[in-house]
Regions:
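Alpha/beta-hydrolase active-site loop
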Residues: 107-129, 150
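Active-site-adjacent alpha-helix of alpha/beta-hydrolase-fold enzymes
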Residues: 191-260, 268, 274-290
Length: 296
C-alpha cells in the first residue's frame, strides 16, 4: 500500500495531469438533451468578455471532440481572438462510429437531432457567460463540415457564418435549405480528396448519399445571396516553394456584408489544414471577426 506521502504525490500528479488536459484541450462537459447524455468540450479564453463569440468546431465521421480540438489548433486562435471554442461530441451510430446526423444514406433511420443539440448549446453557453451577441460560428471537418452546412440552412437565426473543411452539401439538404437570412460560407477543399469528392457524387456511388460538387455548392450559396461579383486568384504556388497551388474564389456584392469564399487546394487530400498551412488562419479569423477584405 502507498504511504500517505506517496499517495499525496500520486494525487498531485493526477490533479496536474487533469489541469494540463483542461488547459490544453478544454473542460469536458455533459448535458442531457432530448433524454440523451451529450458530451462537449469547452475552451474559455483568458480575455473573455460579454462581446465574445462562440465558435463550434465539429469533428468528422468516426472522430472525436478531443481529436479535433488537438489537430485544429483552434484553442490558440480562441486565445488570440477572445472567443469561446466549443467541440461537440457526436453520438454513436448503428455501425459503432461517432457521427453527426446530416442524413447520410446509411444513417437514414437515425432520430438524433444534432441541430437541436447545438442550438441548445448556443443558448445555454450564451446565457452562462452573459454574451451579448447571441450568435455563433461553425466550422468542422468532413462530417463536421456537412454539419456546418446544415446549421447554415436551418439556424441562420443563431449562426453568423460557417467554414466547412472538406465538407459537402448533401442533395437533400440543398433541396430543403431555408436560409432565412444570408450566412457567409468559407469552404476549404482539396481537389484530390478521395472521401468528400471535390467533383461530388450525385449518383451516390460511394454510399454516403447524393451530394453536389464543390463549384456547384459555392454557386448555390452565392446565387441565393445574389452575390454578383466573383474573383479567383492564386494565393500560393508550388513554383514559389509552397506545398500546393491554392486558389481563392470570392463571391460578393458591394451592398451586402455577407460573402461566399472557397479555397481550392490543387492536389489536396482529406485533411484539416496543418500548422504549416498558415494561409487558413487569418482568413478564418477574418470571416468570423473581420471585414472580409479580399487581400489575404
Amino acid at each position: 500500500p502507498l504511504t500517505s506521502s506517496a499517495a499525496s504525490d500520486v494525487y498531485k500528479r493526477q490533479l496536474l495531469s487533469l489541469f494540463n488536459s483542461v488547459l490544453l484541450v478544454g473542460e469536458h462537459r455533459t448535458i442531457i438533451h432530448e433524454g440523451i447524455e451529450r458530451e462537449y468540450i469547452l475552451h474559455v479564453p483568458e480575455n473573455l468578455n460579454n462581446d465574445s463569440s462562440i465558435v463550434f468546431v465539429i469533428h468528422g465521421y468516426t472522430g472525436s471532440a478531443e481529436g479535433i480540438a488537438a489537430y485544429s489548433g483552434m484553442n490558440s486562435i480562441a486565445e488570440r481572438e477572445g472567443f469561446i471554442a466549443v467541440y461537440p461530441q457526436g453520438t454513436i451510430d448503428s455501425y459503432g462510429n461517432a457521427f453527426f446526423n446530416v442524413s447520410y444514406e446509411f444513417n437514414d433511420e437515425s432520430t438524433i437531432n444534432d441541430v437541436s443539440f447545438i442550438r441548445e448549446l448556443v443558448k445555454s453557453i450564451s446565457h452562462e457567460f452573459n454574451l451579448k451577441r447571441k450568435k455563433a460560428f461553425a466550422t468542422g471537418m468532413s462530417n463536421g463540415g456537412e454539419m456546418s452546412y446544415l446549421l447554415a440552412c436551418t439556424s441562420s437565426d443563431l449562426f453568423k457564418a460557417v467554414a466547412p473543411v472538406a465538407g459537402v452539401l448533401m442533395k437533400g439538404l440543398k433541396d430543403s435549405c431555408e436560409l432565412n437570412s444570408p450566412v457567409p460560407v468559407f469552404e476549404i477543399h482539396g481537389t484530390a480528396d478521395k472521401i468528400s469528392l471535390f467533383e461530388g457524387d450525385f449518383n451516390n456511388e460511394e454510399g454516403w448519399g447524393a451530394y453536389y460538387d464543390l463549384p456547384s455548392t459555392i454557386d448555390f450559396f452565392a446565387e441565393r445571396y445574389q452575390l454578383v461579383n466573383k474573383s479567383v486568384k492564386q494565393i500560393t504556388s508550388k513554383e514559389s516553394g509552397a506545398d500546393y497551388d491554392i486558389f481563392f474564389e470570392r463571391h460578393w456584392t458591394d451592398d451586402l456584408e455577407e460573402e461566399v469564399w472557397m479555397y481550392r487546394i490543387e492536389g489536396g487530400r482529406h485533411v484539416w489544414p496543418g500548422s504549416k498551412f498558415k494561409w487558413w488562419d487569418d482568413p478564418l479569423a477574418r470571416l468570423y471577426f473581420g471585414s472580409g477584405n479580399e487581400d489575404i
